Regions:
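Nucleotide-activated donor-binding/catalytic signature segment of Leloir-type glycosyltransferases, i.e.
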Residues: 226-264
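A charged, aromatic-enriched C-terminal amphipathic alpha-helix characteristic of glycosyltransferases
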Residues: 335, 345-378
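A short helix/loop element that forms part of the nucleotide-sugar donor recognition site in Leloir-type
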Residues: 161-175
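Carbohydrate-associated surface elements
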Residues: 135, 155
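Conserved donor-binding/catalytic core segment of Leloir-type glycosyltransferases
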Residues: 4-5, 175-191, 197-200, 212-216
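Aromatic "clamp/platform" in nucleotide-sugar-dependent glycosyltransferases that forms part
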Residues: 277
């Protein structure tokens, strides 16, 4: 079977790159797999597989529709698996709507509701959808009931993220008397980290021996066009006078730390927190969860089903609309503070939620995700499945 992957270059550190990287070895067994690699300029040269690079002066848009078009002609795949959000689909769906032998399957995330105005037409042209949450499945089916698909959660690699001895780690780093919170989120506005910093200020008034680790680096995030889109977290930490209580580990390029170090920091943590306005899945929930760490998240989007009985959900107090018609949910720092204090002061609850999180995360192996996909690919080809627009 010839499979063309489309998404962030699998060697990068983004969430989508990780999702592709985890399942790639299993997809490649007895199959010919290539990738249209977003953000990759061709260097260093990838010697392990054929990769179509997209970052060139001639390609003006990050999503590189013309490179995808070339790859389709050059490779003639049986399956095209796109791994991205839903909102960007209009940038590539015209190319994928052209009649061909391939079956287009989208493994997609949705972080807000309803499905935005502009990506709805694209649903009609995909042969099948792998939703990364039941939330996404419901929102898409409300727009296009005839869309075929199933929910396949992303994986967490047990070789990289695994449970260590928390007591020994805390002793090793002289942190036995310290409450440790972790938030593996970039400065992207949607991640809402400054509100967590506001909540931390209030937590410190009652639990002064508390620190927050922000391991995603301090690089300003950028839009696909290269403009800055995100908070200068280091400046926020200084402005809020939290320098002594917020740790900002980063690599030499000011970006995210390596996975081995990240796993240690998850294991040091007592609570994992994502205060986002919305999440398409939330990989940190399972990366921390596989180490038995409970989570706190906002009761909306995919977060509701991923956290469930594996932590605490905060009810949003307000929402705001995006320009594309979808809306994000906003939590209040006081509610975030209350949830943090509640879990910090109840070790029994932390253990209970942590066990449920670990049990859930351990089921999401890369091999199991890849098997579900490969089985479906074979069926789509055998049955010559068609998109909703051609049925």
């Amino acid at each position: 079977m010839k499979i063309l992957l489309y998404g962030d270059y699998y060697r990068w550190k983004s969430g989508y790159a990780r999702e592709i990287r985890d399942i790639l070895p299993f997809l490649r067994k007895n199959n010919d797999v290539r990738q249209v690699a977003l953000g990759y300029n061709g260097y260093p040269i990838d010697k392990d597989m054929v990769v179509y690079h997209t970052k060139t002066p001639e390609v003006k848009d990050h999503y590189a529709q013309e490179v995808l078009h070339y790859a389709l002609d050059d490779f003639n795949p049986d399956i095209v698996l796109t791994v991205q959000d839903f909102w960007m689909l209009p940038k590539i769906s015209f190319t994928l709507a052209h009649p061909g032998k391939f079956k287009w399957v989208h493994w997609g995330t949705l972080d807000s509701e309803p499905l935005d105005f502009y990506s709805r037409e694209s649903l009609k042209w995909m042969h099948y959808c792998f939703w990364q949450s039941h939330f996404a499945a419901i929102e898409c089916k409300q727009i296009l009931p005839d869309l075929l698909g199933e929910v396949i959660y992303p994986s967490v690699d047990p070789k990289m993220f695994k449970k260590l001895n928390k007591d020994e780690l805390k002793t090793q780093f002289n942190l036995n008397e310290i409450n440790i919170l972790i938030c593996n989120a970039r400065g992207q506005q949607r991640k809402n980290v400054p509100v967590l910093l506001d909540a931390l200020k209030e937590v410190l008034k009652e639990e002064s021996n508390t620190v927050l680790i922000l391991p995603s680096g301090i690089q300003r995030t950028k839009t696909d066009s290269g403009d800055f889109d995100g908070y200068d977290l280091e400046r926020f930490v200084g402005e809020l006078k939290l320098t002594d209580n917020v740790l900002l580990p980063r690599n030499p390029d000011r970006g995210p730390i390596d996975d081995k170090t990240l796993n240690i920091q998850y294991n040091l943590a007592d609570i994992n927190i994502l205060p986002s306005w919305g999440e398409g899945f939330g990989l940190p929930f399972i990366e921390a969860g596989i180490s038995g760490v409970p989570s706190i998240g906002v009761d909306c989007s995919a977060v509701r089903e991923i956290v469930r009985n594996r932590g605490l959900l905060i009810k949003p107090r307000a929402y705001t609309y995006n320009l594309d018609g979808s809306k994000y949910q906003l939590c209040h720092p006081d509610d975030l503070k209350d949830a943090i204090l509640k879990l910090l002061r109840d070790k029994g609850k932390r253990i209970k939620y942590g066990k449920e999180a670990e049990k859930f995360a351990k089921k999401l192996t890369p091999e199991s995700r890849a098997k579900l996909m490969l089985d479906r690919f074979k069926q789509l080809i055998k049955e010559d499945a068609q998109p909703a627009s051609r049925r």
